């Protein structure tokens, strides 16, 4: 399973579409039909047949998904692909992150607050520092292979 934060932003939406597209391309390029005369390779061929990996996207309940949908459309997906699951929460909520990552082998952390307004310092520190710390700690706790 793949877990992505920041899917509604510029980088996260393109990363999501790229990973969905990579899976589609990989799935379509496989020829996994076992050849009857090659019985010894049937087991290895069958292991290539896998369902598309689930991609879990962390987003807030009030998130605007319009950018993500537009980017997916540019990659040829008119609807949210069926292997995408939404996890509603925030990177500052460690428990949600740990639960979402428990089966993840890849995690991509793209969530951030971007602002040049000095009055946003508290929010910047909370999301960008505390949120990233939570992401790293949850990934370590869950044994994520790729972060």
Each language-model region and where it sits:
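Structural motif
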Residues: 1, 105-106, 146
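N-terminal Rossmann NAD(P)H-binding glycine-rich loop of SDR-like oxidoreductase domains
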Residues: 2-22
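Short, basic, low-complexity termini and linkers enriched in Ser/Thr/Gly/Pro
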Residues: 16, 20-49
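A structural signal for isolated positions on well-ordered beta-strands in alpha/beta enzyme cores
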Residues: 54-56, 85
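Glycine-rich phosphate-binding loop and adjoining beta1-alpha1-beta2 segment
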Residues: 56-79
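NAD(P)H-binding glycine-rich loop region in Rossmannoid oxidoreductase-like domains
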Residues: 79-130, 138
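Conserved Rossmann-fold NAD(P)-dependent oxidoreductase catalytic core, especially the SDR/UDP-sugar
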Residues: 130-147
């Amino acid at each position: 399973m793949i877990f992505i934060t920041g899917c509604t932003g510029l980088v996260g939406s393109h990363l999501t579409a790229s990973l969905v597209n990579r899976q589609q391309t990989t799935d379509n390029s496989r020829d996994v039909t076992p050849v009857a005369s090659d019985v010894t390779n049937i087991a290895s061929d069958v292991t290539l047949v896998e369902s598309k990996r689930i991609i879990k996207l962390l987003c807030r309940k009030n998130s605007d998904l319009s950018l993500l949908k537009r980017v997916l459309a540019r990659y040829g997906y008119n609807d949210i692909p069926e292997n995408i699951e939404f996890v509603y929460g925030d990177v500052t909520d460690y428990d949600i992150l740990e639960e979402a990552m428990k089966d993840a082998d890849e995690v991509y952390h793209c969530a951030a607050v971007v602002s040049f307004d000095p009055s946003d310092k508290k929010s910047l520190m909370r999301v960008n520092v505390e949120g990233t710390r939570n992401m790293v700690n949850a990934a370590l706790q869950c044994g994520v292979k790729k972060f």
